[in-house]
């Protein structure tokens, strides 16, 4: 199980996830999902195949965006496969 990504978490290029769910939260922050964008405009293209929020797959620590940058920050206590 891996921590989910939230708005404000960073990737390996130090970009910040700035899009995510407006109504589902982890630790008070919106959850990042497949297709959500970071500050460079790169979309998440890797995500959980089994957990969905707002009909989109949930992104986790280690998942990558269109530039190939992996999420390096996330929730330490909200975990998914």
Can you name each region flagged by the protein language model?
Residues 1-81:
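Intrinsically disordered, low-complexity proline/glycine-rich segments
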């Amino acid at each position: 199980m891996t921590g989910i990504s939230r708005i404000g978490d960073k990737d390996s290029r130090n970009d910040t996830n700035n899009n995510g769910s407006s109504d589902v939260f982890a630790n008070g922050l919106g959850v990042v999902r497949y297709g959500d964008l970071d500050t460079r405009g790169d979309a998440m293209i890797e995500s959980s195949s089994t957990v969905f929020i707002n009909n989109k797959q949930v992104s986790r620590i280690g998942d990558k965006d269109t530039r190939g940058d992996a999420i390096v920050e996330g929730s330490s206590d909200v975990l998914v496969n």
